[in-house]
Amino acid sequence: MSNTSDLSPVHVVGGGLAGSEAAWQLAQAGVPVILHEMRPVRGTDAHKTEQLAELVCSNSFRSDDAETNAVGVLHAEMRLAGSLIMACADAHQVPAGGALAVDREGFSQAVTAKLEAHPLITIVREEVTGLPPEEWGTTIVATGPLTAPSLAEAIQAQTGADALAFFDAIAPIIHFDSINMDVCWFQSRYDKVGPGGTGKDYINCPMDKEQYEAFVAALVEGDKTDFKEWEGTPYFDGCLPIEVMAERGPETLRHGPMKPMGLTNAHNPTVKAYAVVQLRQDNALGTLYNMVGFQTKLKYGSQTGIFKMIPGLENAEFARLGGLHRNTYLNSPVLLDGTLRLKSRETLRFAGQVTGCEGYVESSAIGLLAGRFTAAEKLGQTLTPPPGTTAFGALLGHITGGHIVADDEPGKRSFQPMNVNFGLFPPVDVPKPEGKRLRGKEKTVAKKRALSARALADCRQWLGLLGLGSGLEPAE
């Protein structure tokens, strides 16, 4: 490593997933960091603690399958790159079928401890209002989807472009000892065994047709929070409130988060449930479970009454009820360059959900890239962006090149947040077994395997050329 003792520090604004990962990558490369986090000086509607990298929605990092799932590929690439977020997630995983879910408190405490202990990282608890001052020099802004209005307004003034927004929602969490396990049972869908799992990682609450129809009707009629001042703000499609899905049609939920496929009632194996509500373990002790796909904007009074209609949850005690918050993000394809710098002020780099990516893993990955791009600049190195064939590159390409969709207005374009998915990757030739033509599901799986294998091979090559070691010790 080159001598970095005379380097001026990089300021990172925001101690969420992206900011924490960016700070770690910088420090591991030998670049001093000042990490600014406004909590506990100023809280948000969604955060409950002052820990860094607090998970405010689900505790799931989604699929850990690096062979046939794009987010699993991103997990693998981040591990290759020495990600702090992935190391702490792996160290604090809880059973969740094929998904990587974490004990949210243990996870954020581990991230906080690693950053506090790093000799090149200084954590400052203060709110940064508006854009960071010019005298700070190189700065990464990773203020997250709950970016304070003053900063959003400053960005608008700097760029002349409006920030964009969408709604995101939080699902309720239930105390395990209040769940009636004479009605519910443990099982992962199709008995799938995932990281740290057994194939029996979810609690399943069955409904017959009559119970389901009454439940859907109650959701549609329930008292909902009014957001008049945010009227016109769209929902992120991957995080629709449960009652909004119910309003789309009576069968929507049983083909979505309440689908009964791959599940057999342990108490009554011969009777197929019409719909199933799944609960996922939320902490390492197994004392808390969250309602999968049940993010909601129902008022608290309505939530408790309606969710207790679910068989097995008649006496449920809620550790946290569901909620809704407004997420702010940039029109990144217009405002940012290919390495996440603000075109109108190149000393500013943005990272995380404020750039228009969606999801814990994606936010962390963009923080990782922002940290590495910035470290290379500070060290006088040249760093080419990751190839578009990698999950890193596909996600970065969506944000900065823009998965830009034309709407009804000629010449007008819109940029929408998106999770990483194989649709963002360039096509790949699928190897054909001798004398066999692949069709249907077999062809789809083969294509995903080919995309994944190419991504990981190209990512290894990119990281090998990088010249920045990860230096990551196992998380505790």
Swiss-Prot record:
Q: Which PROSITE patterns match?
A: GIDA_2
Q: What EC class is this?
A: transferase
One Pfam family name from the record? Answer: GIDA
Recorded GO CC terms: cytosol
Q: Where does this one sit in the cell?
A: Cytoplasm
Alphabetically, the GO molecular function entries are: flavin adenine dinucleotide binding; tRNA (uracil(54)-C5)-methyltransferase activity, 5,10-methylenetetrahydrofolate-dependent
Q: Per its UniProt record, what InterPro entries does this chain match?
A: FAD/NAD-bd_sf, MnmG-rel, MnmG-rel_CS, MnmG_N, TrmFO
Q: Which cofactor does it need?
A: FAD
Q: Where does FAD bind?
A: 14-19
First-listed, main subcellular location of the protein, grouped into a coarse class: cytoplasm
Query: Which superkingdom?
Result: Bacteria
- Keyword field contains Kinase: no
Q: Name one GO biological process term.
A: tRNA methylation
Q: Which catalytic reaction applies to this protein?
A: uridine(54) in tRNA + (6R)-5,10-methylene-5,6,7,8-tetrahydrofolate + NADH + H(+) = 5-methyluridine(54) in tRNA + (6S)-5,6,7,8-tetrahydrofolate + NAD(+); uridine(54) in tRNA + (6R)-5,10-methylene-5,6,7,8-tetrahydrofolate + NADPH + H(+) = 5-methyluridine(54) in tRNA + (6S)-5,6,7,8-tetrahydrofolate + NADP(+)
Q: Which UniProt keywords apply?
A: Cytoplasm, FAD, Flavoprotein, Methyltransferase, NAD, NADP, Transferase, tRNA processing
Q: Which Enzyme Commission number(s) are listed?
A: 2.1.1.74
Which family, according to UniProt? Belongs to the MnmG family. TrmFO subfamily.
Q: What does this protein do?
A: Catalyzes the folate-dependent formation of 5-methyl-uridine at position 54 (M-5-U54) in all tRNAs.
Q: What protein name does the entry list?
A: Methylenetetrahydrofolate--tRNA-(uracil-5-)-methyltransferase TrmFO
Which organism is the protein's source? Brucella anthropi (strain ATCC 49188 / DSM 6882 / CCUG 24695 / JCM 21032 / LMG 3331 / NBRC 15819 / NCTC 12168 / Alc 37) (Ochrobactrum anthropi)
Q: What is the lineage of its organism?
A: Bacteria, Pseudomonadati, Pseudomonadota, Alphaproteobacteria, Hyphomicrobiales
